[in-house]
Structures are given as structure tokens and as C-alpha cells.
Amino acid sequence: MRLLIEGARHRLQRAAAALCVVAAFGLPVAASAEVKEVQIARGFAIPHLPIMIMEHDKLLEKHALAAGLGDIRVTYSTIGGGSVMNDSLISGALSFGVGGPPPMLTLWDKTRSAIQVKGVCAEATMPLLLNTRNPNLKTVKDLTEKDKIAVGAVKVSIQARLLQMAAAKAFGDAEFARFDALTVGMNSPDASAALRSGAGEVNTNFSLPPFQYAELKVPGIHTLASSNDIMGGPHTFTMVYATSTFHDANPKTFQAFLAAIKEAIAIINRDKNGVARIYLEMTNSKEAVADIVAILDDPLVQFTMTPVGTMKFADFMYRIEALKNKPNSWQDYFFEEIQNLPGS
């Protein structure tokens, strides 16, 4: 055993001496290689425009090359529903996930002693509309067991949490789950199609742009509530999140991603007409360019990396015991790279 220890000591001494020689002559020291392939998820529709523009214009590849990472392969996949997104991120199938603050907060809470998921940046701030074709419904208080409400994922998606917040606001915190049994999990295009068709059990949809506006063009469909009303103001709708494992092992790739999404947002704000055409091309949507531009021109629709109102979700989820850990501020669940922003 003593001989083994002595041998190990001599090897360490020789390695240290070699490093001193490298440093003395200014020779480069090999660093841990970062990933050569990045997997990014995006959801459906306008709230995910920054990621869509990143994909269309190959912005991450551009910024990775500028950061000295060489040519990297970037794979994008479309996933509907926060629970599926979370499973993919935890399994390592995704480098960057996207979704609403509630699914991210759930992961942050559950992974604190392991891979530690945190927010990378916000993506979009915009209202969601709770639309219905039931003429008997005027407010959320009128919902009954005869109604079926489409949400991204039952109990855990941003739509599901907003519905719980609406129930708590109308009937008290003890009744937060009042509408859970009325919800069905559906992706946004299918949910909107079901509502507009007038067929099937779904007669209410917690929708999102552009689908919510198309729904309101159908006679008989009207809005019960806006998420901004439920939240008491604007809030982040979509955001990006990742594991600390990926963040810590790939600092340059992480910075390249932030630079890429920042450029994508600048493109959206600078060329809304061109971005609308890209959106229609990538989604195979039949909507008019003017309709998409009108949504992008809406002052309530903002693309920004700054988190807005996310602590309201965190406070509510902790209050109903959906979170075991209470964050002190939004900076607790976002990586340090954006903590200089005026978030909330």
C-alpha cells in the first residue's frame, strides 16, 4: 500500500512539473471540451418566435462559431405540454427546454439536490385568453362539471396553474383545485381546432396567440378571463430552462445561446413583417401576414429575456403546496448570467 501511495505521489509531482513548464512557456492548456451537439425544444405558436428565429437563421451556430466552439450541430424539436418537456430535459434528451414558469418551477423544486434545473432567460410576455363557446358562461364562477377545458397539461402547465389561480381568486385558496377535474390535456393547435369545430366535449380553451384571436372570430365564442387579469398584470408566458449540469459543463455554449436569443428578439422587434412570414412558413399556417403582424404590434405582446411576474407563480405554487421550497426572489431559480436584468 505504501508503494502505491508513493507511486501516486511521484506521478502527481511529475504532472505538476509538466504544468509549470506549459505555463512558463505560455503554451495552451487543454480545456474540457464542450458539447458538439445541442438539442433545443420549442413549443407551438407565436410565444416561441425567438426560438423559431434562432432555428431559421441558424443563430446559435453563428454565435458558437464566434465563441471559438467551431461548427456545432443544433437540433430543434417541437414538443407540446410542460410535462413532456420536463421529462425530456431530465432524461438528457434536451439541452434547453421551453415552457411556462410553472413547469420550470416544478423542476427547480424537484431537482434542487440533483441536476438542479434553473431558468436560462424569459422568452415572451403576453396574455392568454380563456375562451368558451358555452353561452351560459360569463365568468369563471359559472363553470360547471358539464364544461371541459383544454390546457397544455393537466395540473402542471401554465394554463392549468392559471386556472387554479382563477379558482383561488374567485372562491378562496382552499378551492384552488375546483376546476382541475374539468381540464383535459391538449396541444394548442388541437385544442383550438376542437373549440372552433363545435364538436366534441371541449367547449372551453385556455388559449394563446395566434389561436385565441382566431377563436374569437367564430360566432358564439367569447372570453371568460385573461391571464393578465388573473395575475394582476403582465407576466412571462414562455421561458427557457436547462440543468445546472449542462450549464456548468458548457459555459461558452450557454453564452452563445444567450447571444443567439438576444439577436433573435432584436430581429423580431426590427422586422415584424419578415418575421411574420417566417412564422407562417415554419408552421404551415394559413393565416394572413397582416394578422400575425397585428399580434406582434400589440403592446401587450413583448419578446424579452427579462422575467416578468414569475414570483407570483412561485408564491401561489408554494401557498398551495405545489412547491416544497419557497424562493426568496426570481434570481433563486434563474442562472446568474441574466440576474442583472430588472426581473420579477
Description of each model-found segment:
Residues 16-28:
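Bacterial N-terminal signal peptides
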Residues 2-19:
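Bacterial N-terminal signal peptides that target proteins for export
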Residues 34-176, 181-185, 199, 203-209, ...:
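Short, glycine-/small- and polar/acidic-enriched structural segments
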Residues 69-75, 174-181, 283-295, 324-330:
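Short, surface-exposed acidic
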Residues 247-324:
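Secondary-structure end/capping motifs
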Residues 62, 83, 87, 91, ...:
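Solvent-exposed, polar/charged alpha-helical surfaces in well-ordered, non-transmembrane soluble domains
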Residues 317-344:
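Conserved C-terminal helix/tail region of periplasmic/extracytoplasmic solute-binding proteins
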Residues 172, 180, 189-280:
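Pocket-lining segment of extracytoplasmic ligand-binding domains
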